[in-house]
């Protein structure tokens, strides 16, 4: 009888530990859809002008035909190629946590992205853009953690680049 109670207690403790250590991953609100359009070039990346004056940084966005997007914020002086696109450690970390990876959709001249933030697997952010032409778009709205909303007029420009990182991720369905 005592042995059965001990086994039951150990089983309960192990169950609680396993539940506590599991990763809760937020689902993206947007669905991944293949991108078949020509509204944006996808054979490279887009980089923004400097943003957030108190913290000199800029954004880099990458799009794929399978509907996956990557959006990364870098500090001024960092290289999009060296510190992001060709940095295997960063890419591996981005896919395993997840952060910065997500999906996008285009409707007429509007671009919408939803990407993981990476803080505890539970958060995503959405950003909305106006497409100017196939090599330029402007961020208009950004919705962050817990719905915090900010408005921008941040211009992104295209730079041809190859090879882009692989876009597969277990967190993108």
Where are the model-predicted features located?
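Lipid interaction determinants
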Residues: 21-101, 112-173
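Bacterial Sec-dependent N-terminal signal peptides
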Residues: 1-31
């Amino acid at each position: 009888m005592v042995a059965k109670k001990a086994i039951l207690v150990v089983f309960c403790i192990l169950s609680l530990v396993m539940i506590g250590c599991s990763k809760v991953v937020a689902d993206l609100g947007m669905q991944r859809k293949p991108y078949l359009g020509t509204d944006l070039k996808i054979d490279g990346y887009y980089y923004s002008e400097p943003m957030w004056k108190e913290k000199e940084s800029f954004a880099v966005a990458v799009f794929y035909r399978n509907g996956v997007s990557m959006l990364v914020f870098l500090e001024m002086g960092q290289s999009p190629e060296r510190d992001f696109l060709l940095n295997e450690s960063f890419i591996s970390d981005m896919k395993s946590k997840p952060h910065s990876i997500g999906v996008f959709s285009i409707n007429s001249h509007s671009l919408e992205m939803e990407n993981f933030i990476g803080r505890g697997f539970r958060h995503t952010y959405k950003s909305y853009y106006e497409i100017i032409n196939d090599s330029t778009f402007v961020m208009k709205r950004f919705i962050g953690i817990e719905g915090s909303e900010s408005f921008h007029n941040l211009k992104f420009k295209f730079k041809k680049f190859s090879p882009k990182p692989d876009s597969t991720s277990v967190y993108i369905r």
